[in-house]
């Protein structure tokens, strides 16, 4: 063998601490205090799980692999992604595990900082500069906060469905407060066992009617219209600053890029762990549904925070996880 080639091969084996003898296991270490330019061994861990996955992919299926993660919160903006041929085998599995009993969290969210006091017990924070997602969930101190809604509890009732029984209905005077920014408003209407969640297009305050951006209820089956189950179906409205009046409620003004939140009396705004989601999934495995997905194990890891945005034309549930396709 050419001596230069031999030297290069030995360098990579030593530098990356990779043992390729039969029966051995490849171990890559990750720490929040690591460095993605390091070799990933015990004394020189990598910083991100993504880099660890990238480094081991050429060896997946050839020997057992463990990505060992030290205590900490690891934030991702896109899911950890694998193809069907990158998932190990029965003899050579891929494991992504916490080190000993360390607390390891993989989070698809971004923490909010620098809250400012507004009036009426409300605090606000500006969205991160590079954050461009729409979202409808805010996590505060490890719980899902309540999106500002009206009424706070129970429901309103439709006075009468509009002529097409699909895209608009009438309401009673003073049913809900006058909303300044209708473009941020969402309607949630109950169809017996399912719901429609859809953006409001306009509100005619003179004629007391509300119109949505598309059909309320799934287009098929055809009976998913406004008044099929109840002549005066239940509904509530979400995401208006006028509704943000109770502890634990929040509202987002997407035009101003600001979130408003009403803390509970026992919450210190400076210690608030408020997270908005960014990653649409946490783990994504590509492949045909009939393919063997391989052998990948996650052990001792907590997964938190994902972003699911309702379709632009609305989410209309049907049954058994089926919903109206409006892509």
Each language-model region and where it sits:
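Sec-dependent signal peptide recognition
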Residues: 2-11
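Hydrophobic h-region of N-terminal signal peptides that target proteins for export
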Residues: 10-19
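Boundary at the C-terminal end of the N-terminal hydrophobic targeting segment
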Residues: 22-23
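Extracellular polysaccharide-degrading/modifying enzymes targeting complex plant/algal/animal polysaccharides
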Residues: 29-327
